[in-house]
Amino acid sequence: MNKDLKIALKAARAGVETINSFKTKALNIQQKGYHDLVTDADLATEETILGILREEFPNDEILAEETENEETLTSGRTWIVDPIDGTTNFAHDFPIYCVSVALWVNKKPEVAVVIEVNRNEEFTAVAGEGAKLNGKVIHVSNKSEPEKAFVATGFPYNDLSLVDPYLKLFRHLMEELQGIRRPGAATFDLCCVACGRFDGFYEYSLHAWDVAAASLIIKEAGGTVTNWLGEDDWLFGQRIVAGNQKIHSHLLKRLKEYIPEELRENVS
């Protein structure tokens, strides 16, 4: 096994163990921003994961959600970590939340691990080697007709700048898609695209740690990931659309129809 993947799995699995240790405890829940929660489980899980990464790779850079580092990449090796993606779900005992660990090298994704805690599903990818779910190769779906497409999205609770055109888009998609879901954890949504459960995904107000791992998993599963302008510059832009090639193209077309261009541009 690729050494970086081996350590990423070790760190992510240790993070899952830390999360599970909090399930029988009373959580300390705080707001770090408008409608943006953090729990003591997030902090402890991040500490667990970063401890392993720093021990194994002391010279690597780290970008992690709860350390609030500036969202940038160096030309070297950077680990991008979300200790609990879906903190609000976790805080309310809604059983969809993930640990996400990614390695980017020279500003490109190289290794990705996402573990959905309650289902114990391990999604992994190494650049150029495909994507797997619990060790089995996965691929995006082959759906091409919108009326047969099953799509995921999100409704950012701390950014209402797009809510009006976003809901108009949502209403239109309700009429032409087979179904839309909002599980509340972008990493899980994206991984479900990678394994063919969902055919596409779109959302805004996402950060690098929300998409760094799962987007590589989608690409290695044969899918497409772009920003809302159809460009490859999506890691820090806070706008993402993904899917198999056909459904990605359809969602991108609808985004262009319903969201003004200035609101589709990356957020710097």
Where are the predicted features?
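N-terminal subdomain of lithium-sensitive/metallo-dependent phosphomonoesterases centered on the IMPase/IPPase/PAP
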Residues: M1-I84, D232, K246, H250-K253, ...
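Oxyanion/phosphate-interacting regions
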Residues: M1-K10, K168-E175, F188-S268
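Residue-level signal for inorganic ion chemistry
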Residues: I19, D42, L53, T87, ...
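Generic detector of well-ordered alpha-helical packing
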Residues: L43, E47, E66, P83-G86, ...
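Residue-level detector of anion-binding/catalytic polar loops
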Residues: N59-E61, V137, G179, D199, ...
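Glycine-rich active-site/cofactor-binding loop and its immediate structural neighborhood
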Residues: R77-R119
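Acidic beta-strand-loop-alpha-helix segment within the catalytic core
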Residues: A102-L190, G237-S268
